[in-house]
Amino acid sequence: MSQKLLPLNPRQMVGLADGNSFYCSCEESVQPWLYGKPIIVASNNDGCAIAMNRLAKKYVKMGDAMFQITDTIREHGIVTFSSNYELYGDLSNRMHSIFSSYNPNYERYSIDEGFLDFTGMEGFDFEKLGRDIIRSTRRGIGIPICLGIAPTKVLAKAANKLAKTDDARRGLYIIDTEEKRVEALKKLPIGDVWGIGNATYDKIT
């Protein structure tokens, strides 16, 4: 028997905005010559890869030891950086300032992501608003972002993930109807749903 989903609340909408490959994007924002190049940011002691942009993820995984991927770095022309937390912190604060300018109830969630509360804005043009937030952030600080908008934080997280993986969406994914919710959940692997840990995943698969 299939489980019936609870109806969406048209008055409640949440946005999750976050910086794409944030540490790498920070490096790109102050060094424009990096655009179009694979980038890795290494840990404090340059021991392992802690961040990669989309191009570098084709060749390197999170946590790879730097000394073990020397040949890969050379072969694919990957640009590497030591962590620069002063830069990342500064751009993070500026990015969150842009996000909060769109929403008085903005909730900073981590260094590179936060929730916007759009409750009570039913009927609003979220496509236009979302594009404006994405454009303002890119123009203001050079950081590309993705934005997911949905009735709950869990669905906003799911929408954000789909905004990253579906190039046709150009960084914005909105779940505002029952049909879109069903479509989104079909596309997203169970293990990628926010709040479902390994133990829960094992029980339901």
Task: Please provide the spans of the model-predicted regions.
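Short beta-strand-to-loop capping motifs
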Residues: 116-122
